Amino acid sequence: MQTSESTPKVEGALNAEGVPNVESAPKVEGTEYRSGFYREAGFYDAHSLPDYGAQSPVTREAFAYDFFPATRDISSPAPLLVWVHGGAWRFGTNQALRDTILRTPGGEQPNTQALMRAAFQQAGWAVASINYRYSHQALFPGALHDVKEAVRFFRANAHEFGIDPQRIAVAGGSAGGHLSMMVAHTGDSAAGASVSEDSVSKDSAFGDSASAPEHDEYFEGRAASAYPSHSSQVAAAASFYGVSDLRTIFTDRPLAGYALDHPEDDGAEWRLLGSTHPVPADVSTIDASKGERVVPGVCIERAQKNWERAHPIDAVRPQKRVNKVESASAPGVSGGATALMLVHGISDSCVPYQQSVRVYQALRTRQVPTDLVLVPDAEHGDSRCFSPDIVQQMLLFLNRAIQINRGV
């Protein structure tokens, strides 16, 4: 693990055994942040954001953000880390990075993700923690569209937030790791191209409209964007125990010696994509005794399209490159080939670490900057994945990837 004077250490979050230690954890007093909504009030109602068959109404909180400014004085606009929370695409909140000390029924313990946020601020980064629509509010690619809209929002309002629109990175854990990889590696197949709401049909979100560039509207969601002329391309990304291939998650678990079904999962994949895999041929022939499931009211064709396109591994494999256009909004970063750091616990029984290994190997084959940290004995969501050393390594990797030290 490397360290640098430009990336201050976060000391004391864990003890020698890697267990959270509240007594020695740094206390960040008076954390300042601002909250808001990256989809403006009423916009999602007026434009009837597609839910792709989901069952629950959308509230304004689905588009909430917390923005934490850089705390280190810097002479130029700060780079921005957009943090995407986890929670099986159905739970979680953007507020998870607010408090560095968690108060639970069992007592106080360090919030290692918030400590990561504080370390980034101290290193000159701004951090934005965002919400997105849960799978019961919008099936995929709804959540992906939301994260990309958040990137566009901060890019469009960079001056107001004091950030550099060319130096935006995205990161997240678990479901947030999956979405972060999707944002990073689906790129911006028509960067800067404005798409009016009338120019893209509702079906084009699934790649069926000749008026939209190939893959573009399915991955981008510009038809319902308030900032369609702004790029969603990011300069770098990080995934903590994220899913890279939803098709293989259920075979990876038994192969790794874990149970096929995981209590934290509870059908998260089919609830996100619209059906179990393989996709049933007909809603009327669903056989629940065989484990087949379909979200009520979903279009089978949409579920099929989701199962074809919702996997970061397909976007990074050379033979399945999604995007071949280099974005002018992120110099040196080609669509589908964004620098990516991966962190995964070796004892992860929910998302086996092989899910990250495959992405790492694919990026190495393509000679794309990447790093993989495997954490011994760490389970899914383990605080040891955010140890001070790993936070240091993440800072160094992202600093290099966005060329933060260029000319400094």
Residue ranges with predicted function:
Residues 2-4, 12, 22-408:
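Alpha/beta-hydrolase superfamily serine-hydrolase fold, recognizing
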